[in-house]
Amino acid sequence: MPSMLTHKLFAEEAAEKLSFGMTEREKRVRLWGAQGPDVLFFHRHMPLHKRGESISEWGHKMHTMPDPAPVIAQLQRCEQEKLGGEVGQAWRQGFLCHYLLDRTCHPFVLAWSKKRNERDPQQPVCYWHQEIEANLDTMMLRRERGLLPQEVSLRRVLPPLEGDAPIIAAHLKKIIFAAFSVEVPLSLILQAMNDAVLGVRLSNDRTGLKHHFFRRMERKKVWRISSRLLPMTEDPDADFANLEHEEWGAQGENEDFFALYDRALEESGHFFRLYASKDAQQVTTGLPFC
């Protein structure tokens, strides 16, 4: 999947393109939605926060379910119920942006991770995956905003909610149940959201010193930590975005990441019209998050 900054950028651009509500409250909550089920990944994952039951598996399972139509159908029911009012709608818009970008771009990231692993098997596919996403975040930030990582705080990705966390937790509880028939306590979802904020804070690296330090520490090891941190600039020899248009897909796909991102943005209007008027299976067309 694209990483956190890229999802943030996409949701902001889609919101502007589609004239979504732009109150400060809506924008904050939409950014949380833009991270999709990924916020669950952080639950009980941070150092000193690993004790007790974790609900991170439901985020991973949602990403890998063959067809997320049950999730989309539940979001459509939330629309009919007007769950959370305009704030709830903003979160759903962000979540749908997450799904649209993931299903368009994640096949490339998966394939590219395997190719990088074939060329350098010292790093497992999972760490190449993280390395590619981190570099793409750096590249997308420069492309879309003309900024370098040191000019942006990652904390903006999950801004303070000022009392709206229960609305988000209620949505996540409903879509987990719709997808897997599992009742997850709201308290654990709220805990996962807090862990996500902590994870973002720990990943914030505006000086670049964290990335430099951990990359040196992991020089002859797997990039367990450094691959999660944004580099100041990407490795020019790595072609993380496939600007050379090497074939990567089973059907001969060779698009670069920027083209895939632009395609998702171009399709956003049609996608949201389908969501508003058709059943969930017509929205997903059987395409998973990844």
Question: What positions do the PLM features span?
Answer:
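N-terminal leader/auxiliary helical segments
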Residues: 1-94, 99-290
